Amino acid sequence: MESQSRRRRPLRRPETLVQGEAAESDSDLSASSSEEEELYLGPSGPTRGRPTGLRVAGEAAETDSDPEPEPKAAPRDLPPLVVQRETAGEAWAEEEAPAPAPARSLLQLRLAESQARLDHDVAAAVSGVYRRAGRDVAALAGRLAAAQAAGLAAAHSVRLARGDLCALAERLDIVASCRLLPDIRGVPGTEPEQDPGPRA
Protein backbone atom coordinates (compact mmCIF):
# COMPACT_ATOMS: atom_id res chain seq x y z
CA MET A 1 0.00 0.00 0.00
CA GLU A 2 2.72 2.37 0.86
CA SER A 3 4.39 1.60 -2.42
CA GLN A 4 1.16 2.31 -4.32
CA SER A 5 0.68 5.65 -2.53
CA ARG A 6 4.20 6.59 -3.34
CA ARG A 7 3.63 5.78 -6.98
CA ARG A 8 0.45 7.82 -7.15
CA ARG A 9 2.03 11.00 -5.80
CA PRO A 10 3.39 13.11 -8.61
CA LEU A 11 6.82 14.49 -8.31
CA ARG A 12 6.95 18.23 -7.71
CA ARG A 13 9.36 20.39 -9.62
CA PRO A 14 11.52 22.84 -7.69
CA GLU A 15 10.06 26.33 -7.93
CA THR A 16 12.33 29.22 -8.92
CA LEU A 17 11.23 32.81 -8.35
CA VAL A 18 12.42 35.28 -11.01
CA GLN A 19 11.83 39.02 -10.62
CA GLY A 20 9.50 40.29 -13.31
CA GLU A 21 6.47 38.94 -15.06
CA ALA A 22 5.50 35.38 -14.19
CA ALA A 23 5.25 32.86 -16.97
CA GLU A 24 1.87 31.33 -17.71
CA SER A 25 1.52 27.64 -17.02
CA ASP A 26 -1.12 25.17 -18.01
CA SER A 27 -2.65 25.26 -14.57
CA ASP A 28 -2.85 29.07 -14.50
CA LEU A 29 -4.37 29.50 -17.98
CA SER A 30 -7.87 28.61 -16.89
CA ALA A 31 -7.85 30.88 -13.83
CA SER A 32 -5.90 33.95 -14.94
CA SER A 33 -6.30 34.04 -18.72
CA SER A 34 -8.42 37.23 -18.67
CA GLU A 35 -6.94 38.88 -15.59
CA GLU A 36 -3.83 41.02 -15.34
CA GLU A 37 -1.33 40.49 -12.62
CA GLU A 38 -0.96 43.16 -10.00
CA LEU A 39 2.22 43.53 -8.02
CA TYR A 40 2.62 45.52 -4.87
CA LEU A 41 5.43 48.05 -4.85
CA GLY A 42 7.37 48.78 -1.74
CA PRO A 43 8.45 46.64 1.20
CA SER A 44 6.58 43.51 2.06
CA GLY A 45 3.82 43.84 4.60
CA PRO A 46 1.67 46.83 5.44
CA THR A 47 3.36 50.23 5.71
CA ARG A 48 2.30 52.94 8.02
CA GLY A 49 1.30 56.31 6.62
CA ARG A 50 2.14 55.43 2.99
CA PRO A 51 -0.32 53.85 0.58
CA THR A 52 0.99 51.00 -1.44
CA GLY A 53 1.17 51.53 -5.16
CA LEU A 54 -0.03 49.22 -7.88
CA ARG A 55 1.59 48.48 -11.19
CA VAL A 56 -0.96 47.98 -13.94
CA ALA A 57 -0.10 46.91 -17.42
CA GLY A 58 -0.81 49.64 -19.93
CA GLU A 59 0.12 53.27 -20.62
CA ALA A 60 1.10 55.33 -17.57
CA ALA A 61 -0.81 58.54 -16.85
CA GLU A 62 0.96 61.86 -17.20
CA THR A 63 2.07 63.54 -13.99
CA ASP A 64 3.48 66.92 -13.11
CA SER A 65 6.91 65.42 -12.70
CA ASP A 66 7.09 64.36 -16.36
CA PRO A 67 9.56 66.48 -18.33
CA GLU A 68 7.87 68.92 -20.66
CA PRO A 69 9.08 69.04 -24.26
CA GLU A 70 11.38 71.94 -24.94
CA PRO A 71 10.08 74.48 -27.47
CA LYS A 72 11.78 74.22 -30.79
CA ALA A 73 13.43 77.31 -32.19
CA ALA A 74 12.10 78.63 -35.45
CA PRO A 75 14.32 78.10 -38.50
CA ARG A 76 16.58 81.00 -39.33
CA ASP A 77 15.57 81.24 -42.98
CA LEU A 78 12.05 82.42 -42.14
CA PRO A 79 11.45 86.21 -42.18
CA PRO A 80 10.69 87.89 -38.86
CA LEU A 81 7.04 88.19 -37.89
CA VAL A 82 5.75 91.74 -37.92
CA VAL A 83 2.58 92.45 -35.95
CA GLN A 84 0.61 95.55 -36.88
CA ARG A 85 -1.77 96.82 -34.28
CA GLU A 86 -4.54 99.25 -35.10
CA THR A 87 -5.31 101.93 -32.59
CA ALA A 88 -8.85 103.07 -31.96
CA GLY A 89 -9.90 106.08 -34.01
CA GLU A 90 -6.93 105.88 -36.41
CA ALA A 91 -7.72 107.39 -39.81
CA TRP A 92 -6.53 105.54 -42.90
CA ALA A 93 -5.85 108.66 -44.97
CA GLU A 94 -3.93 110.41 -42.24
CA GLU A 95 -0.28 111.00 -43.07
CA GLU A 96 2.38 111.61 -40.54
CA ALA A 97 3.96 115.02 -40.74
CA PRO A 98 7.72 114.99 -41.30
CA ALA A 99 9.77 115.58 -38.23
CA PRO A 100 11.16 119.12 -38.06
CA ALA A 101 14.80 119.41 -38.97
CA PRO A 102 17.11 120.13 -36.08
CA ALA A 103 18.30 123.70 -35.77
CA ARG A 104 21.72 124.32 -37.29
CA SER A 105 24.46 125.93 -35.36
CA LEU A 106 26.36 129.02 -36.51
CA LEU A 107 29.39 126.93 -37.44
CA GLN A 108 27.29 124.67 -39.64
CA LEU A 109 25.76 127.69 -41.39
CA ARG A 110 29.20 129.19 -42.04
CA LEU A 111 30.47 125.88 -43.37
CA ALA A 112 27.45 125.58 -45.68
CA GLU A 113 27.97 129.13 -47.00
CA SER A 114 31.69 128.56 -47.62
CA GLN A 115 30.92 125.27 -49.37
CA ALA A 116 28.36 127.01 -51.60
CA ARG A 117 30.85 129.77 -52.48
CA LEU A 118 33.55 127.22 -53.25
CA ASP A 119 31.21 125.28 -55.52
CA HIS A 120 30.23 128.49 -57.33
CA ASP A 121 33.86 129.56 -57.80
CA VAL A 122 34.90 126.16 -59.10
CA ALA A 123 31.96 126.06 -61.52
CA ALA A 124 32.74 129.60 -62.75
CA ALA A 125 36.44 128.78 -63.26
CA VAL A 126 35.68 125.59 -65.17
CA SER A 127 33.09 127.32 -67.36
CA GLY A 128 35.53 130.21 -68.05
CA VAL A 129 38.26 127.78 -69.10
CA TYR A 130 35.85 125.99 -71.41
CA ARG A 131 34.65 129.28 -72.93
CA ARG A 132 38.21 130.51 -73.59
CA ALA A 133 39.18 127.18 -75.09
CA GLY A 134 36.09 127.28 -77.30
CA ARG A 135 36.92 130.80 -78.52
CA ASP A 136 40.52 129.81 -79.27
CA VAL A 137 39.42 126.75 -81.19
CA ALA A 138 36.88 128.81 -83.17
CA ALA A 139 39.52 131.43 -84.06
CA LEU A 140 41.99 128.75 -85.14
CA ALA A 141 39.31 127.11 -87.26
CA GLY A 142 38.57 130.49 -88.91
CA ARG A 143 42.26 131.03 -89.69
CA LEU A 144 42.57 127.57 -91.17
CA ALA A 145 39.49 128.18 -93.32
CA ALA A 146 40.92 131.50 -94.57
CA ALA A 147 44.27 129.89 -95.37
CA GLN A 148 42.50 127.11 -97.23
CA ALA A 149 40.51 129.66 -99.27
CA ALA A 150 43.68 131.61 -100.09
CA GLY A 151 45.42 128.41 -101.18
CA LEU A 152 42.50 127.50 -103.42
CA ALA A 153 42.51 131.00 -104.98
CA ALA A 154 46.26 130.85 -105.61
CA ALA A 155 45.93 127.43 -107.20
CA HIS A 156 43.17 128.73 -109.47
CA SER A 157 45.29 131.74 -110.50
CA VAL A 158 48.27 129.52 -111.27
CA ARG A 159 46.05 127.23 -113.32
CA LEU A 160 44.73 130.22 -115.35
CA ALA A 161 48.25 131.61 -115.90
CA ARG A 162 49.45 128.22 -117.06
CA GLY A 163 46.60 128.05 -119.53
CA ASP A 164 47.46 131.49 -120.89
CA LEU A 165 51.13 130.61 -121.24
CA CYS A 166 50.29 127.41 -123.08
CA ALA A 167 48.07 129.33 -125.51
CA LEU A 168 50.81 131.93 -126.14
CA ALA A 169 53.41 129.22 -126.76
CA GLU A 170 51.14 127.57 -129.32
CA ARG A 171 50.68 130.87 -131.15
CA LEU A 172 54.41 131.55 -131.23
CA ASP A 173 55.02 128.10 -132.67
CA ILE A 174 52.43 128.76 -135.37
CA VAL A 175 54.03 132.09 -136.32
CA ALA A 176 57.54 130.64 -136.38
CA SER A 177 56.60 127.68 -138.53
CA CYS A 178 54.49 129.62 -141.05
CA ARG A 179 56.36 130.39 -144.42
CA LEU A 180 53.61 132.40 -146.02
CA LEU A 181 54.48 135.56 -144.15
CA PRO A 182 57.13 137.87 -145.77
CA ASP A 183 60.52 138.16 -144.31
CA ILE A 184 60.44 141.57 -142.71
CA ARG A 185 64.00 141.46 -141.65
CA GLY A 186 65.58 142.10 -145.18
CA VAL A 187 63.00 144.44 -146.72
CA PRO A 188 64.46 147.92 -147.58
CA GLY A 189 62.89 150.91 -146.02
CA THR A 190 62.19 149.07 -142.88
CA GLU A 191 65.36 150.07 -141.20
CA PRO A 192 64.91 152.65 -138.50
CA GLU A 193 65.80 156.17 -139.42
CA GLN A 194 68.83 157.63 -137.76
CA ASP A 195 68.36 160.91 -135.98
CA PRO A 196 70.38 163.80 -137.55
CA GLY A 197 72.94 165.37 -135.41
CA PRO A 198 72.56 168.75 -133.89
CA ARG A 199 72.53 171.57 -136.30
CA ALA A 200 75.33 174.17 -136.16
Swiss-Prot record:
Modified residues (Phosphothreonine): 63
PTM section of the record: Phosphorylated.
Gene Ontology MF terms in the entry: protein transmembrane transporter activity
Gene Ontology biological process terms, A to Z: anterograde axonal transport; anterograde synaptic vesicle transport; endosome to melanosome transport; eye development; melanosome organization; melanosome transport; neuron projection development; platelet activation
Subcellular location: Cytoplasm
Composition bias type Low complexity, residue spans: 41-55
Quaternary structure (record): Component of the biogenesis of lysosome-related organelles complex 1 (BLOC-1) composed of BLOC1S1, BLOC1S2, BLOC1S3, BLOC1S4, BLOC1S5, BLOC1S6, DTNBP1/BLOC1S7 and SNAPIN/BLOC1S8. Octamer composed of one copy each BLOC1S1, BLOC1S2, BLOC1S3, BLOC1S4, BLOC1S5, BLOC1S6, DTNBP1/BLOC1S7 and SNAPIN/BLOC1S8. The BLOC-1 complex associates with the AP-3 protein complex and membrane protein cargos. Interacts directly with BLOC1S2. Interacts with BLOC1S4, BLOC1S5 and BLOC1S6.
Protein's name according to its UniProt entry: Biogenesis of lysosome-related organelles complex 1 subunit 3
Organism classification: Eukaryota, Metazoa, Chordata, Craniata, Vertebrata
Gene name, Swiss-Prot/TrEMBL: BLOC1S3
